[in-house]
Structures are given as C-alpha cells and as structure tokens.
Design a protein with these regions (language model features):
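Alpha-helical segment proximal to the catalytic Tyr-Lys
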Residues: 132, 177-178, 240
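Substrate-binding pocket helix/loop in short-chain dehydrogenase/reductase
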Residues: 102-104, 111-114, 200, 208, ...
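Short, small/polar-rich loop/turn modules that mediate ligand/substrate recognition or access, typified
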Residues: 139, 180, 185, 242-244, ...
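Short C-terminal tail/terminal secondary-structure segment
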Residues: 2-4, 98-101, 232, 243-256
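Catalytic Tyr-X3-Lys loop
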Residues: 105-124, 143, 168, 218
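Active-site helix of classical SDR
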Residues: 127, 164, 172
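Residue(s) in the substrate-gating loop at a strand-loop-helix junction
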Residues: 147
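A glycine/serine/threonine-rich, flexible loop-to-helix segment
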Residues: 48, 181, 191-216
Length: 256
C-alpha cells in the first residue's frame, strides 16, 4: 500500500503552498490524489498553475490569497477551504519567513513582532480556525514547519527567526496533547539546509551554503522534495501513533 492510497480523496490546506517547500508539498499531495486548498500571499501565478495541475487530475482545488498575520484573513482562509473542498482532513502550517538578518543590537521591537507574527501567531490563527473542522474527521492531522535553526539557534542574524521556530517545536508538543482527544495528530518537521528555495536564495550566500554542505554527513544539501515527502508521511495515517514529534530533515548535521 502506498501513501497515495492513504491520501487519495483527503482534503488538505497548505499555507504558503505556492512557493519553495510549500509548492513541493502541494504537488506531492496532488500527485497522491488529495484535494488541495493552496494559500498564497504573493505567488498568484504559481498558485493558479497548481490549481490547473490539480484540476487536470480531476481533483477539487482552490487558491486563496491572504495575510495570515491578520486574524480575519486566517479565519476566512479556513472557511473558504471547507466550503470549496467539503471538509478538512489535514492542515499544513508552512507559512514563515526570516524576513531579514538582524543582530540583537539592531533589533527594532516592530521587527521582532513582525517575524513572530509571520512565523508563530499566524500559525495559531489558522490552527484555531481549522481545529473544529479537523475534529469532524477521523485520523485528522496537522504538520507544522519548524527549522533546524529552532534547535540550534541558526546563523548570526537569525535571533528572532530561530526563536519563533524553536517555539513551534513546543507549540507542536502542546497542541498534540490538547488536540489528541479529538483525534487530531500534530507533528512538525525541522528542515536544515534546503537549497533551491527563495528562502536560501535570498538569505544564504553560495559560499555559506558550500561551507555548510561540507559538514553534512551525506555530503549534499537538501531539496524541497526531501521535505515534502516527510510532510506527507507525517500527514498520512501511516504514523497513527506518532504525535507531538518533530522529524529532523538535515542530512545528519546538527551544528548549522
């Protein structure tokens, strides 16, 4: 039996599902026969391409824009998703950003709150809105996107990003305990160096990536598909007794 058998016909919401790791996750769900709601903030063209990709396979799909740091946008996202797909089985909390590198000495209070809102508060907004719908389905699940930076602190200038991603590790465990009785599993993935994404294209130099790759035991950086496959595993019913866990996807390196 394959993952596609477990995911076929399931209704999935992926935040930031039209770029980088999120785009790969969306494609893998579509290829597994799942119906998808694709949230995006600015990647409208890619979102529409993904909608066509899913529609051509006979799947239900919708692309929804929104600023998830706004409570009303998060609530609307979930409402529109449920109306379009007919329910919700799986939530993928992928939205997040480093925004910029800033050391503590140059950290403005406004910037701190901005990154925390993008990475953490928005996740709470969407999850809070989605939880009652997830409760209506057996074996529902949530997968949160954390980061190796949340375990190790990240590179210089990652203070608020790493802090927010570290909070997601605890958020995942706490939520697993809270939502377990309703039948919803909650897990996370913590990617390491994942190249070919806008995140690292923007915030990681080629020299830094090459130096980091030297320290990875399997001698290569990760890619978006590496993360997507792990997300689909945790989202599926195959891990029915795994909840509150964080799966590290970093090639065996823990000192980035």
């Amino acid at each position: 039996m394959t993952n596609s058998n477990k995911l076929s016909g399931k209704n999935i919401l992926i935040t930031a599902g039209a770029q980088g790791i999120g785009e790969a996750i969306t494609k893998h769900f579509i290829d597994s026969g799942a119906n998808v709601a694709i949230h995006y903030f600015s990647s409208a063209d890619t979102a529409n391409e993904l909608v066509k990709y899913a529609t051509d396979k006979g799947l239900k799909t919708i692309a929804i824009s929104g600023d998830l740091t706004k409570e009303e946008d998060a609530n609307a996202l979930v409402k529109i998703t449920v109306e379009a797909l007919g329910g919700l089985n799986i939530l993928i909390n992928n939205a997040g950003s480093l925004v910029a590198r800033k050391m503590l000495s140059e950290m403005e209070t406004e910037f701190w709150h901005k990154v925390m809102d993008i990475n953490l508060t928005s996740m709470m907004f969407v999850t809070r809105a989605a939880a009652p719908y997830l409760a209506k389905n057996e074996n529902s699940s949530i997968v949160n996107l954390a980061s190796l930076a949340g375990r190790k602190g990240g590179h210089p200038g990652s203070l608020v990003y790493a802090t927010s991603k570290g909070a997601i590790l605890t958020y995942t465990r706490a939520l697993a305990s809270e939502l377990g009785p309703q039948g919803t599993r909650v897990n996370a993935v913590a990617p390491g160096l994942i190249l070919g994404t806008s995140f690292h294209n923007t915030h990681t130099t080629k020299e830094s990536a090459a130096e980091t790759t030297k320290g990875i035991p399997i001698q290569r950086a990760g890619n978006a598909d590496d993360v997507a496959r792990a997300v689909l595993y945790l989202a599926s019913e195959y891990d029915g007794f795994i909840t509150g866990a964080t799966l590290d996807i970093n090639g065996g390196v823990y000192n980035m």
